[in-house]
Amino acid sequence: SQGLVLPIGTFQFPWFSHVNVKEGHDLTEELGVQKWELPLSPQLAGKAKGNFPSFLKKTDQERIQNCYKEMKRDHADKLFEGSIKLDGSSMTVYLKDDVFGVCSRNLDLQETEDNTFWKVARKNKFEEMLRAYGKNVAIQGELMGPGIQGNRENLPDHEFFLFDVWDIDGQNYYTSLESGDFVADCRDSGYKLETVPYVSMIRIMEFSLEDILKKSDVKSLNHPVAEGIVYRSMEDSSVSFKAINNKFLLQEK
């Protein structure tokens, strides 16, 4: 999601002026900007059972360039935990009122033999794991491997890397400590549950915007250039942002 800087005079719209358009104004709809994403393979796209469930929350973070002032104003002294932003495909697995489901970023998917999301869920016994845990929860993470975003990490098989646990009944994310306990419980029960790599902790009051962006220049799982770092508040995981590695953006041009 890169942009192009142009002088205001370039835009031939009557409403586009210094008076009507201020810093931070979202011009997506006015300019007709649309996001283009690589088309998914049939094994990833799957067959839809329905739209992404309303009782879940989609995974998304604001870029730090768009929210640094607000973060420093409202959360300056809070401790944020940083994890590697993996370049894969968003995957959500849930158990609600005895119903088990698997979702891509936008869809609740039917189980079919060739769907990669469901195959990974079955391989890792996620249904048994969530039933053993005994609560209405969803796990959200990155699906990585062959055929996904060019498989930058050069993984031989498809793997799931957890980054969030969503409490369906409470409609909130687990805190970092609660997520850690969840992962430990699942592993102690014999289930395989990989997490995204954790890298550092910061307090926003101690870093400038430029410093936070520089910290995103790190290695990924296997690739020398990570996509970036996602930071989540240790107190409230719904407070989060991402810092994208400029080296990654240059490679993606």
Predicted stretch roles:
Residues 1-253:
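Core nucleotide-handling region used for phosphoryl-transfer chemistry
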